[in-house]
Amino acid sequence: NGGANAKASTDGSAVGYRVGQQRLVNETPKRDLDTEKVSYVAQSSNPFSLHSVVPADQAVYTKKALERIGDVDQFLVDELGYNDKDDMYKALASEQADSVALAIHQAKQGKAFIIGDMTGIGKGRQAAAMIRFAYKQGNIPVFITAKKDLFSDIYRDLKSIGNSELRPFIWAADDKVHSADMTDKDGNIVFKRTSDKEQKRVMEYLVKNGKLPEEYDYIVTTYDSFNSGTIEYENGNKKARKDGKGSKNGQLKRDVLEHIALNANVIMDESHKAGGQGGGSAYLQYVVPKLNAVTFLSATYAKRPDNMPIYALRTSMNQAGMESSELIDAIKRGGATLQEIMSQALASSGQFIRRERDMTGVTIDWKAIDDPEVVAEQREQYDSIIGLFNDIINFQRTYVSAYVDRRNEELAEVQSSIGIMRGTEALGIKNQPFASKTYNMVQQVLLSLKAREAAKSGIEHLKNGEKIVIALNNTNESQTGQFGIGEEIDAPDLGVSLKKGLEGTLRYTSKNAKDESESGYIN
């Protein structure tokens, strides 16, 4: 097959390909009206395929978008600077080659591209390829992600596509718990976090020269770098905060990205984190139109309606001519049906792709807990905890709401109002179910009830010489993130969550006549 034997890496990316594993080169499979997904047929001729599937209503549009590029493999050899197609095949699986080609094609036209692949298709390697593209073009690659520990992941992906030599400017605050150092797969530090003093020097250099110093090749940072500043952003405009508050250091970071925007190719990993109504999101929506190129990556890119405006800035969505608020309202009204239509339209424009692993033939064995004693014990525990939920809800309704109403009457004369912060009223019950505290707490309760039986099952498999993987719906990082690696802690219980929920009922937000908001806790 003309290439070295290899296998897929753990992130779903390809390192060469297996002997005899051939991609099926055929037309997009025909489907019945009730078919949700069809096999993905790659435009790339790389024999190594991840054997993915694609939403049936996007398959034809994706194929036509790729056909407009033509020879995807030669296109990537030219744009990414590989020696030949076989060299490129060792870096990118056929699915990855297709999406990277589409992303580059859009970047060259000044448009954005959204990679919405699910876990197992290798979004990290695709992001690395876009860093390589920006570097080859002489632009500044800027990789923005959700967490610092993902810096190491992008380094490993860069190494996998042949670019381990690229030197990162690691633009992040010092954090003893969550290190920003880049490590290899064995945990060895390859690149240390750039020191605070050096970060300041490089930022000043970027503002003055519009490019990176010679000792750096690309930038890595996180979304929270842009969360706070002394300037407010809205509808493409900016103005200084009236109260003069805000982070000067955060504003400097914002100014730096704006200064280099014309030369910057920004890769937004976990791009749903870039959307929303916060200050950092407003800034990113301000700067995205100024960037040389932008690529978004997220399996849940359209997680909420307020995620969408940032994508509209550089895709065909902007042809609707709607303000951000209008777009959000339209998506709220249109729901899943409208989002599906929008995804089709983006795929037709060559600006969106979504694949996932084929789960055909995978069986799921549902284990029911049927021991009468265990069931009785769990029922008693559940009823007890739900009783505490109701106590907290009643406490807020009886005492906190009454206090807020009384304060509103007192403040009415000075045209100021006070209201319960979103997410705390009735312990979150009046919020969207998936964002409410009660939903998350019930999930924790159910996990706690099942954990012991799951552990027993896992121990039995271990005794049989089998390796196990235990998958959790939620890692509860918000409660465990403050603990250091290897630190001994007391066995956690639901009391921690219940206490946080109770404290949350005392949170309030106040707004004065100038429409300025402050938050705090009722004493």
Over which residues does each language-model region extend?
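N-terminal accessory segments
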Residues: 5-92, 392-401, 411-418
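SF2 helicase/translocase NTPase motor core
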Residues: 60-91, 124, 135-282, 290, ...
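N-terminal pre-P-loop "Q-motif" helix
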Residues: 89-111, 446, 450
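Walker A/P-loop
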Residues: 110-130
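Short hydrophobic/aromatic beta-strand immediately N-terminal to the Walker A/P-loop
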Residues: 112-118, 142, 469-471
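Conserved Walker B
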Residues: 118-119, 270-272, 299
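Conserved P-loop NTPase motor "coupling/switch" region that bridges the ATPase
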Residues: 265, 281-364
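Conserved helicase/translocase motor-coupling segment
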Residues: 353-484
